[in-house]
Amino acid sequence: MAAAGEVVMLGGILLPLLLVVAVSGEPPPISRRSFPEGFIFGTASSSYQYEGGAREGGRGPSIWDTFTHQHPDKIADKSNGDVAADSYHLYKEDVRIMKDMGVDAYRFSISWTRILPNGSLSGGINREGISYYNNLINELLLKGVQPFVTLFHWDSPQALEDKYNGFLSPNIINDYKEYAETCFKEFGDRVKHWITFNEPLSFCVAGYASGGMFAPGRCSPWEGNCSAGDSGREPYTACHHQLLAHAETVRLYKEKYQVLQKGKIGITLVSNWFVPFSRSKSNIDAARRALDFMLGWFMDPLIRGEYPLSMRELVRNRLPQFTKEQSELIKGSFDFIGLNYYTSNYAGSLPPSNGLNNSYSTDARANLTAVRNGIPIGPQAASPWLYIYPQGFRELVLYVKENYGNPTIYITENGVDEFNNKTLPLQEALKDDTRIDYYHKHLLSLLSAIRDGANVKGYFAWSLLDNFEWSNGYTVRFGINFVDYNDGAKRYPKMSAHWFKEFLQK
């Protein structure tokens, strides 16, 4: 696997592409026409990061409302998503921007508490929330943009957190399923692509381990400033319940709605690519374990009905088990896989822990770093975790192809950030050459994987707009369009938006 991490990624189609870059200093040209006929290009967003209108239109509080207001110290600039990019009021402007760019599709998420303010169907449906999403969906279709709808992008109802600890309880499976069915009933005549969960890994690890940097902010006391939690058990429990809720919801959709509505349903996962720190067997094994704990945690159940062997051996009784019926239900429970890729790491082997302070962050016995022998794996972006490594994109996509039966894939997020430099004049802030270079090289890498047989059907850039970036608040900007938070969230196209418009011309 050292060879796979360091040599194979230069093989096949990618080698001549990289040679062109090396010789000329510029990547070869690429456009929509480089990709297969019918390939979908879009941009992506999420409700809490974009909408604002936190207390408008009958919306109930989510765990992110509670988290940002009770723990502003956990957000880099002590901000929140009360207003965010104000898409609750400016959605027509956003759709106009997309139409002008020429995108095919828009991936957005529905705020659970805008539909069911109390989290459960028994608490009543909020018709104002239904109207907002109907208006957004209809506006998209009017302008020729397909809606790709995520049902859960981390903003679970605070009412269910208070009632039974949210995703730590199996009770959430039925409440989630009823919420999803409400969406199928209300929007499924027009929505043809559903995503049950966005990045379960990020929600479960950052919310229940890793110092509790995401809502609901739980972790073991020795791992961070958390009021409660167990970093060695709760991440696995929460994600187990997400997988079960996913499987139950997919069965419901396929049995009751798919034939009539003619839609597809899947789940979005995130993974880095991992390059062995050296060619030693221990480091090659560590890179594989890192993939198991980030991607296999979900792909193995979806394909094989059980967690990866490495997880079962290392996590042992802290890892929940599927019953035989659950295993059969989850196996194959998707029409497509959404895959998010941003960055890569080196992986080195770690000795077994002492068994006292168990945590997801050490269970894989892999030391993840972006620097080897003083040299970073690639240029660093604004976020401390994001190093630019386009080759890893190809490697990850081909790894899914080769290890999980070449499923239909949509790249549901890919992007890079810059610092929010408030001293820059607007015209300077719109110059984002690094982002253009990032997208250009990552699209070349993806195209190489497609030409090597990966069944990828679409690509969504993260993100359409600058937005609330979770624990980073507004200190970084991921958008291809600039949002002026000091002037009514006015939108201005960055250079990357112009680049994409040219790229997308048919």
Swiss-Prot record:
**Which top-level group of life is the source organism from?**
Eukaryota
**Annotated EC:** 3.2.1.21
Family annotation (Pfam families): Glyco_hydro_1 (PF00232)
UniProt GO BP: carbohydrate metabolic process
Q: Name one GO molecular function term.
A: beta-galactosidase activity
* Sites where the protein binds a beta-D-glucoside: 49, 153, 198-199, 342, 413, 462, 469-470, 478
The name under which this protein is listed is Beta-glucosidase 13
